From Swiss-Prot:
Gene name per UniProt: sspI
Family membership: Belongs to the SspI family.
Pfam families: SSPI
Keywords: Sporulation
InterPro entries: SspI
Claim: Calcium is one of the keywords in the record: no
Lineage top rank: taxon: Bacteria
One biological process term in Gene Ontology: sporulation resulting in formation of a cellular spore
Protein name: Small, acid-soluble spore protein I
Compartments, as annotated in UniProt: Spore core
Keyword Ion transport assigned: no
Chief place where the protein resides: other
Induction / repression: Expressed only in the forespore compartment of sporulating cells.
Amino acid sequence: MDLNLRHAVIQNIANNTKEQLEDTIVDAIQRGEEKYLPGLGVLFEEIWKHSSEQQKEEMLTTLEQAVKQHA
């Protein structure tokens, strides 16, 4: 069986509202289980592909600061 993870994740949330999307993200992060990381990666990939250069720069700055706090 060839499971296309990207397609499965997108299909699973395709009709979700903003609030439902937020709940999905927050729940996955709070649970802290590694099994949710691929799905979060797919969501981030979609955010990245649909963001402006300015938004990408802001995300990168935020990410840089966040990872430095954990170093």
